[in-house]
Regions:
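Formylglycine-dependent sulfatase
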Residues: 1-401
Length: 401
């Protein structure tokens, strides 16, 4: 919210309904099919536009900026690398360090354990600096690394511009966060997803984010009314959502650390800060019941809610790999229909964006209602940097942005 207060909020911003396609569109400014990633990298086919191989004719904004004198860094999740290239052997052309980022610290893939991630430093696997028992969390770790990198640049090359891509594993499953963050939402979802949808729509109308005559879409097939659920369902479902909400707020706290660091360095007012709330709509991948272990849901392994009840306090912790049920995904995509993976409906593609640049934008606290897409980010960055759209990058003629 503070970023929006310092700039503008975009409430009709859209992604591709999936992770990898959104990320390649974000980083290149081109349609995801023209960039070769029509779906998540792991399910690539040999079909044109869906082989997960970004061609050299589609350069990333990181490479464009690097070639124009910017320091470039990436921390967090990178999910636009072909699955067969994700190994210690490479090739590394489509890893972050091969796509214009001079530094990379994070993981390559769709998701990872937030307490014990599969970490990479550039192209080499490394162990986390400490364990979950010692207080480790991936979001905090990459925020530490991002701040350290920015401070190092500020000391060594204070006048050199930089481009930093911070891509949290949150709030993708598993929804891992410490108990103190989960406890902040204890009981807040006992009212159920139907009541939350009603409240969310009312708040959106009050803030002018949707027209006054906006109506809610119906529940997806198979999702029951909250009042029709039994006590076991309500207890488990509410707890899974508490963990998600705690993780979301914890992530916002890490973003606040980034802006605070920029302010401390005296660079915040001159920094174009773009906050994108996700690469797709809320996910239905937890199934109708949600799950204590998302890998069970993804592999079609049945679970019994009664088996989760004794482990409620473990949800969000190192022994879990949790994901909320579909009903909560529908609620979080209010007022739209459907969820992540469904590109035909705004429930899959609608993601809010906040953008600030105090010394570069006159607007403060406004809302932009125009229809925007993730491919609009790169031309915005180039215009802000005073750079033209490149026609050649490293000798390769570029597809138009």
């Amino acid at each position: 919210q503070s970023i929006a207060d310092d700039g503008v909020l975009y409430n009709r911003f859209h992604t591709t309904a999936l992770c990898s396609p959104t990320r390649v569109a974000l980083l290149t400014g081109r349609n995801h099919h023209s960039a070769g990633i029509g779906s998540v990298a792991e399910v690539a086919t040999g079909a044109p536009g869906n082989d997960s191989v970004r061609p050299n004719t589609v350069a990333t904004v990181a490479e464009m900026l690097r070639l124009n004198g910017y320091s470039t860094g990436c921390v967090g999740k990178a999910h636009q690398t072909p699955a067969w290239e994700v190994s210690m052997s490479g090739p590394f052309d489509r890893w972050p360090t091969g796509e214009g980022f001079e530094k990379f610290y994070g993981f390559v893939g769709g998701e990872t354990n937030q307490w014990s991630p599969t970490l990479m430093l550039n192209t080499s696997p490394i162990e986390p600096p400490k364990t979950a028992e010692e207080g480790y969390h991936f979001s905090e770790d990459i925020t530490d690394k991002a701040i350290s990198w920015m401070r190092g640049l500020d000391v060594m090359t204070p006048d050199k511009p930089f481009f930093l891509y911070v891509s949290y594993g949150a709030t993708h499953a598993p929804h891992h966060v410490s108990q103190e963050w989960i406890d902040k939402y204890k009981g807040k979802f006992d009212k159920g997803w139907d009541a939350v949808r009603d409240e969310t729509l009312a708040n959106m109308k009050a803030k002018g984010l949707v027209p006054e005559n906006t109506e809610l879409t119906g529940r997806p097939e198979g999702v029951e009314a909250w009042d029709d659920l039994d006590d076991t369902q309500k207890t488990v479902y509410a707890r899974l959502m508490e963990a998600y909400a705690g993780m979301a707020e914890h992530t916002d706290a890490q973003v606040a650390r980034l802006t605070d660091a920029l302010k401390d360095m005296g660079k915040y007012d001159d920094t174009l800060f773009i906050y994108i709330a996700g690469d797709n709509g809320a996910s239905a991948e937890g199934g109708l019941d949600g799950t204590f272990n998302e890998l069970m849901a993804l592999n079609g392994i049945p679970q019994v809610l009664e088996d989760i009840l004794p482990r409620l306090d473990e949800i969000g912790g190192p022994t879990s790999f949790n994901h909320y049920p579909v009903g909560w995904a529908h609620a979080m995509n209010t007022p739209f229909q459907y969820t992540k993976q469904v590109a035909s409906h705004y429930g899959g593609t609608s993601n809010a964006v906040a953008m600030s640049w105090p010394n570069g934008m006159e607007a403060r606290g406004g809302v932009r209602q125009q229809w925007h897409h993730v491919i609009d980010i790169v031309p915005t960055i180039l215009e802000a940097a005073g750079l033209p759209e490149p026609y050649l990058v490293n000798g390769a003629a570029q597809k138009p942005i």
